[in-house]
Amino acid sequence: MGAASGQRGQGPPSPLLLLWLSLLLLLLPPSPAPALDPGLQPGNFSADEIGAHLFAESYNSSAEQVIFQSTVASWAYDTNMTEENARLQEEAELIWQEFAEVWGKKAKELFDAIRQNFTDSKLRRVIETIRTLGPANLPLARRQQYNSLQNNMNRIYSTSKVCLPNKTATCWSLEPELTNILASSRSYAKLLFAWESWHDVVGIPLKPLYQDFTALSNEAYKQDGFSDTGAYWRSAYDSPSFEETLEHLYHQLEPLYLNLHAYVRRALHRRYGDKYINLRGPIPAHLLGDMWAQSWDNIYDMVVPFPNKPNLDVTNTMVQKGWNVTHMFRVAEEFFTSMGLSPMPPEFWAESMLEKPTDGREVVCHASAWDFFNRKDFRIKQCTRITMEQLSTVHHEMGHVQYYLQYKDLTVPLRRGANPGFHEAIGDVLALSVSTPAHLHKIGLLDRVANDLESDINYLLKMALEKIAFLPFGYLVDQWRWGVFSGHTPPSRYNFDWWYFRTKYQGICPPVVRNETHFDAGAKFHIPSGTPYIRYFVSFILQFQFHQALCKEAGHQGPLHQCDIYQSTQAGAKLQRVLQAGYSRPWQEVLKEMVGSDTLDAQALLEYFQPVIRWLQEQNQRNGEVLGWPEYQWRPPLPDNYPEGIDLVTDETEAERFVEEYDRTARVLWNEYAEANWQYNTNITLEASKILLQKNKKVANHTLKYGTLAKKFDVSNFQNYTIKRIIKKVQNMDRAVLPPKELEEYNQILMDMETTYSIANVCYLNGTCLHLEPDLTNVMATSRKYEELLWVWKSWRDKVGRAILPLFPKYVELSNKIAHLNGYADGGDSWRSSYESKSLEQDLEQLYQELQPLYLNLHAYVRRSLHRHYGSQHINLDGPIPAHLLGNMWAQTWSNIYDLVAPFPSAPNLDATEAMIKQGWTPRRIFKEADDFFTSLGLLPVSEEFWNKSMLEKPGDGREVVCHASAWDFYNGKDFRIKQCTSVNMEDLVIAHHEMGHIQYFMQYKDLPVTFREGANPGFHEAIGDVLALSVSTPKHLHSLNLLSSEGGGYEHDINFLMKMALDKIAFIPFSYLIDQWRWRVFDGSITKENYNQEWWSLRLKYQGLCPPVPRSQDDFDPGSKFHVPANVPYIRYFVSFIIQFQFHEALCRAAGHTGPLHKCDIYQSKEAGKLLADTMKMGYSKPWPEAMKLITGQPNMSASAMMNYFKPLTEWLVTENRRHGETLGWPEYNWTPNTARSEGPFPESGRVNFLGMYLEPQQARVGQWVLLFLGVSLLVATLGLTHRLFSIRQHGHSLHRPHRGPQFGSEVELRHS
C-alpha cells in the first residue's frame, strides 16, 4: 500500500521525553514565513468559463514549479531527517500553502457562483480542486503550527526505536527489526514486547499532538464548506451514499472474514494453547504476523491447510537465487512493460531510495511512490527487504508510478486517481498475477506448478490471509478517525473507541492492559501522517473487479485465482485507458468502462475466493468452531518472566532441527562413552580410567554445548509436546555445568569412590583376602556365627567407608553446585525432579506409612527367630536387631536367613539353589531361562550380540571388575549387555530376570529419541524385571523349571512362600526409603559432615529397627559401604519400584486371566500380559509416568494396595503369631546394643583366633589370655562404657525427632545412562 507499512518507537528517549520535546518545539515562536515569488501569483481573469480555462492553464504551469520544489524538500526530509531538512521542508510547505491560498481564494472569488454551470466537466473538476484550500485556509501562525505538528508526528513515528529491557545499546527500528520480529518470531513474550513497546513509544507522545492537529485540520476544512476533515476525505468519492455503500460491502464480506478468523484462531490455539487463545474470544493483536494485525500472511506457516504441498512463500528461493532489491524492481517493471505499459524513466533508477541507507541517516521507511510533477521525475522510497511480501509491495508501489506516468500530461489538479482507491488498486491488480504459482514458476521462483485442489486451497488461504484479513482493518481505521473528526470520539475516549472498533470488526484484543494514557491508533503510520485509509478498503474491492475484467480481456479461461495477465497487451491497453483518465472523469464512469458496472461490488472478490470459502466453512463446521467472539471481554494473561525472557527462541521448527541434531550427535557420543565405561567396569586399570575420563569429558562438553543451546528456547507454549519435553530435559546439563577444573575434580572424585568400592577386599593375617563378590556376600548369606559375621561386617566398613569419607564432603559440595547451576535448590531437589511431582515426598511418606505395620510385624517375628538362634546376649526382644545378622551386608533383604525363620520348617524347601547346582545350571543358563520368560510373553529376544558381549560371571583371569549387577544400553539400537558376577543360586536367578527387564526396556524404546530412552520414572525401569521375577519365584513356575519337586498349594506351603518373598520385598521397604532420606538431608545441609554416621544410624534405627553390632564413630562412614552412595546412584527408585511392581503384577495377572490369590499368579506365556507390558515400555520417558501407570494399571497413582493384597495371607498369619507370643512391635528399648565382648573362637579358612584384634595361633592366644586377664577385664568394662555413652549421644540426637521426607524404589540395579 502506497502508505501501508510502519515504523517503531524511540530507543533511549522515553515517550514522555519525546512528548515534552515536541510540545516545546510547538511553543517556540514561529519563524518568518518565506514569501511566494510574485511571478507565481494569479493574474486577472474573467469570471466566465473562458476565463476559467485561462485560469486553469496559468495555474498549471505555476503549480508544477511550486509542487516540484515542495516535493523535493519533502523527499530530502523523508530520506534524511535532520533539523535543517525539517526547516527547509516546512518553508517549502508554507510556500505551497501560500500558493494554494492565493489561487484558491481567486478561484472562489471568480468562479464559485458559476462553476456548476460549466459545460466542460473536466474544467469544473479542476476549479473545484483548486478552490479547496485545506490547511491553507489557516492564518499563518496556525498554519505554521499545523505544519510543525505534522512534521513532529512524522518524526516521532519514523525515528522512534524500541530498546531491549536494561539494554539501551540494543535498540530496534520499525524497519526492518520490529517488522521482522512480528513477521517471523513465534515467541509470545518477544512478540508482546515488540508490540507493547512500539505502541507505547510512538502512541503516548503522539496523543496531545494529534488532538491539536485534529482541531486545526477541522478548522481548515470547515472554511472549504465541509463539516469536518472526515467529510472532506469522503468527498473524494463523490457519492452521497458512500458510507452506506461501504457498510453494505463490509457485511457482504463479513461471513468470509468470520470463517477465516475462526480457522486462524484454532491454528493459533494449537500453537499457543488455552492460556493465550480463547476459542470463543478475540485474538491477541500481536500474534498475527504484523504490527497492526492488518494482514496475516506472515503466519501462513502456522495455518497452512496442506503442509506437504509445495511451499508458496518463495522468500527462501529469492534469497538462494541471489535476488537483490534492484532485481525485484526490474522484475516489477518488466511485468508492466510486458503488457505494453511504460518503463520507468532514468530519473526513477537514479533518484529512488529502494533500500534503507546504511550511512546512519534517519529515514521514513514507510513505502511510498512520489510524483514530482515535472512529468519526468518519479521515485519510490522503500526500505525493501528480500521477501515475497515485499515483492508484492514493490509491484504495488510501481503501480502508483505507472499511474503517474500515464496521466502525467493532464493538468495538475487531474493528476490523481479516479478516486483514492483506484490509485491503491493498480499495483495490487498486477500483484494478484505475480503471486500465482504459474507466474512464480515463470520467473524462476517455483520449481513446478501443482494443479490440484489441495495446492489451490493452500494458495487461496495464503491470499486470504493478505486480502480478507485486511478488510475489517481497512474499514475501521477511518471509521474511528471520522468519529474523532466529528467529535463523536473525544480525546478522553481515543483509545477506548479504537479498541472498540478493533474488537467489533477484527475480533482482536490488546494483549496487555491499555488505557487513555495510550494512543494505540498513533502506532499506525497513516494516523500521524494524516493519510486517509478508507482508500485501501476501496482498493481491495476494486482490484478484484479490475482483475476479473483484465483476465477476461486477456482471454483467461478457468478459475479467477489462476489468472496471470503477464504479457497480455490487450489487458495492458484496457488498463492504460483507466490510468490515462486520471481524475478527469467521475470514477463511476471510468469503472464502468473498465468492468461494465459503475458500482463497487464484492462479487469478483467472492468468486476469486469461492473454493477456500467453501473449504473454511467445512473445516469450521467439522471442528465445531464458534464464528465470532461472543466472549469479547476476554483478555490474555501476561507471560511469566516478562519482559526479561523475550530473547528466548520459540520457533518450534528451529527447535525440531535442534532436537534432531542433538539426538544424532548424542547417540554417537553416548555410545563411545558407554564402551569406555564398559571397558573400565570390566577391567579396572589406570589406562581404562584415563580413557573413561576423556570420554566423560567429551560427553560433558556435548551436554554443556547443547544444554546451553537448549536454554535459549522458551518451550512454555510449544504445542509439540515431544519437542517441548526433550528440550526441557536437555536444558538440565547435570555435571556439565561445572567449570572445567571442578568438573575434572568431580569426575575424579566419583571415579575414586567407585574404584575404592569396587576393588576393596578384606584380608586375614595369613594373607587370604576376600572380595565383596562373591566372598563376603556368601559369608553374610550362609554363616550363622555371630563373630564371623561381625568380623566381615566391620572389616568391610573399615576398609571401604573410611576410605571414601575424605572424598564425600567435596562430592556433596560439587553435587549441590551442579544442582544450583541447573536451577535446583540442592542435589536432592535435582534427583527428585525426575519424578515430575510436587507432592513426591508426601506421596512416598504415605506409602511408607501404609506398609509400616506389615514391616513391624515381620521385624518382630524375625527378631524372635534370631533370639532363638543367638540368645538374649545378642538379641533383645524389645530392641533393634544387630545389623549383621540378617543375611546381607546391608540388611536390605533378609531372604538368606529364611532357614532361621521359616514358619513351617517341615514344609517343602522353596529355595531352588540346591536343585540348580545339582542340575548343573550355569550363569548362561540362568539368563537363557530369563530370556525365555520374556519371549513367552511375546516380547523381544535378546540378540546374539548380547550373548557375545555381556559379562555374565566374574572373570577368572584376575581382572578387577565392578561386580555390582548392571544392565547397559549402548545407544545404537542393537547393543545391549549385562554385567553381573552371577552365582548359581536362586537369588541370582531373580536378579537375572531383573537385569533382563532392563534389557527388555532398552529394546522396546530403542527407536525413541535418546532423551526418552529411560523409564517413565527411574522406578519403572527397576520394576519391569522384578515383575517377571514375581512370577518366576512362584512354586508353580519353579516346578515348571524342574527346580522344585511340586507346585505346593497347601496353607503352610503358601505361608512359607510368602515369608520368603516378604524377607525380600517387605524387609527392603524401609532400607530403600531411608538411604535417600539421608542423602537428601546431606544435600540440604541438615546433616553435616560432622554427623554423617550418627545420622545414618539414627535413620536405620528409626526405619529399619537396626543397630550397629559394634560402636561406630564419626571416623566411620557406613553409608559409603553401600555401592549406590559412592557410585552416585539415587536410591529412591528402588522404593518406588518395590511399590509399583506389585501394581504392575496385579494388572498383568488380570490381563493374563489369572484367578485366585495374587501371590500364586504366573504370567508366563501370556501374550496379553506381554502386550500390555510392551506398550508401557515403548513409551520410555516420552510421557509423564502417571500416563504410563494409567496405561498398564488403568489409573495414574502409586498405591501400596496391590502389595498389601499380595501379602495379605502372611500379614494375617504374622499378626496372629506375634500376638500369640506377645511380641513387641517396634523397638522401644532403642538404646540397647548387643554384647560387644567377643568369644575368642577360630575363624574358618585361617585356623587362627582373634585376640584383642590380633589373629594368633590358638596356643599363643591361650597364653595371652592368662597373662593379660586383668587387662582384658578392664578393657571389657571400658568398652562397654564407651559403647553405652556413644549410643546415648546417638539416640538422643535431634534427628530422631526430625520429620522425614522422601521417595525410593525397587530391586536394585545400577543403570548406566550418560
From Swiss-Prot:
Residues 36-1265 are extracellular. GO terms for molecular function: calmodulin binding; carboxypeptidase activity; chloride ion binding; metal ion binding; metallodipeptidase activity; metalloendopeptidase activity; peptidase activity; peptidyl-dipeptidase activity. Its EC number is 3.4.15.1. Residues 1-35 form the signal peptide. Chloride 1 binds at Y237, R535. Chloride 2 binds at R797, W1096, R1100. It is an enzyme of class 3 (hydrolase). It is a single-pass type I membrane protein. Zn(2+) 1 binds at H396, H400, E424. Residues 1283-1314 are cytoplasmic. Residues 1221-1262 are annotated as: Juxtamembrane stalk. The dipeptidyl carboxypeptidase activity is strongly activated by chloride. The dipeptidyl carboxypeptidase activity is specifically inhibited by lisinopril, captopril and enalaprilat. InterPro entries: Peptidase_M2. Chloride 3 binds at Y835, R1133. The chain crosses the membrane at residues 1266-1282. The active site is at E397 (proton acceptor 1), H526 (proton donor 1), E995 (proton acceptor 2), H1124 (proton donor 2). The keyword Iron-sulfur does not apply. Gene3D superfamilies: 1.10.1370.30. Monomer and homodimer; homodimerizes following binding to an inhibitor. Interacts with calmodulin (CALM1, CALM2 or CALM3); interaction takes place in the cytoplasmic region and regulates phosphorylation and proteolytic cleavage. Dipeptidyl carboxypeptidase that removes dipeptides from the C-terminus of a variety of circulating hormones, such as angiotensin I, bradykinin or enkephalins, thereby playing a key role in the regulation of blood pressure, electrolyte homeostasis or synaptic plasticity. Composed of two similar catalytic domains, each possessing a functional active site, with different selectivity for substrates. This is Angiotensin-converting enzyme. It comes from Mesocricetus auratus (Golden hamster). The gene is Ace.
